[in-house]
């Protein structure tokens, strides 16, 4: 461990132990950091939640057909941060292998890995991969409804490091979801709700 890591660990413990209370979003994060507390009673779980007034299957409005054209293709969608927490190589490989099928892939968002996706799209001629800017929040239920399946390819190093909060909005909109992350089921939702099989 480097001197920098040692110092940061000490700062982390100091913050935890000087605080009146600390919250985390699930059991995974709780179990990861609880041993760093002198008083574990300071650590509390407040789960992620969904605004069901916005995210529900009936809240659908027309989309810009220049961005989201009406076609009979199977549409797979990811919306959110395009970062290192996700593994984008399986997506690129999948788009390449299915380029002759009636399947389109939509990635909506920004992040440090967006340039990688755009580079792969250009180099490999992946015309059915659409990399789009963030869309207005009020349109997200409609965008989820536009697609047939949502997907999340988690990076292997993120195994069991919490649960993607976007899963809850997808579930609230009653859309199917494909999550890929090594050999393990994602997070603690399968254990709590009997899903993820």
Predicted feature locations:
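Conserved donor-binding loops in enzymes that form glycosidic bonds
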Residues: 21, 48, 78-83, 110, ...
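Carbohydrate-associated surface elements
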Residues: 28, 46-49
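Nucleotide-sugar-dependent
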Residues: 86, 134-143, 150-171, 176-192
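Acidic anion/phosphate-binding donor-loop and adjacent secondary structure
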Residues: 31-34, 40, 50-66, 87
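Conserved donor-binding/catalytic core segment of Leloir-type glycosyltransferases
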Residues: 68-86, 92-95, 106
